[in-house]
């Protein structure tokens, strides 16, 4: 196999931001509804888009609110999350081996792409000083994960086949 492209997700692969998400949800639920957000509830949110998380958690906590109120709450959560990132995100949040892996791929001439569904991804990678040859904009993707669209967009950008990617 001739490896030409390595495609990475962000959260849980490049960087650990779980604690920031948990804290943001915790603050939101305490402020808006007087609810103590739990780690058990947090497990429901792994890999799920923000508004879908809000709907799942509203159901979990038996919160009765219309979609507009939930959408506003999800946006408030994101503002809290972004503030936490501004205050606390540092290179110590980069997962072990990532910097070495990215350097090795660059040295070997393998393209790197970030395929994250997080709209906060550009801020996070800039803040951490990470560089990718291409970052897929999730706003340009028709179908979110687990559909392959975001990965196909990275492959199409470089004109490579699936056999040339990891």
Residue ranges of each PLM-predicted region?
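N-terminal helical cap/lid subdomain that shapes the substrate entry/recognition surface
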Residues: 2-99, 104, 108
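Substrate-recognition "cap/lid" segment bordering the active-site pocket of phosphatases
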Residues: 91, 119-166
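A generic structural-conservation signal
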Residues: 39, 67, 114, 132-134, ...
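Structured helix-beta-strand junction loops
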Residues: 48, 108-109, 131, 138
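Substrate-recognition element of Asp-dependent hydrolases with the DxDx(T/V) motif
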Residues: 98-127
């Amino acid at each position: 196999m001739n490896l030409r492209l390595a495609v990475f997700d962000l959260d849980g692969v490049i960087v650990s931001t779980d604690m920031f998400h948990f804290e943001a949800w915790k603050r939101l639920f305490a402020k808006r509804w007087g609810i103590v957000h739990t780690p058990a509830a947090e497990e429901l949110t792994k890999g799920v888009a923000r508004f879908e998380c809000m709907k799942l958690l509203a159901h979990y906590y038996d919160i009765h609110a219309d979609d507009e109120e939930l959408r506003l709450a999800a946006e408030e959560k994101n503002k809290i999350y972004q503030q936490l990132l501004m205050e606390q995100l540092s290179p110590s949040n980069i997962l072990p081996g990532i910097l070495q892996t990215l350097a090795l791929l660059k040295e070997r001439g393998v393209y790197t792409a970030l395929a994250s569904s997080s709209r906060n991804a550009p801020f996070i990678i800039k803040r951490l000083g990470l560089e990718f040859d291409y970052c897929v904009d999730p706003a340009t993707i028709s179908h979110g994960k687990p559909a392959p669209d975001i990965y196909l967009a990275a492959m199409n950008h470089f004109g490579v086949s699936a056999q040339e990617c990891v």
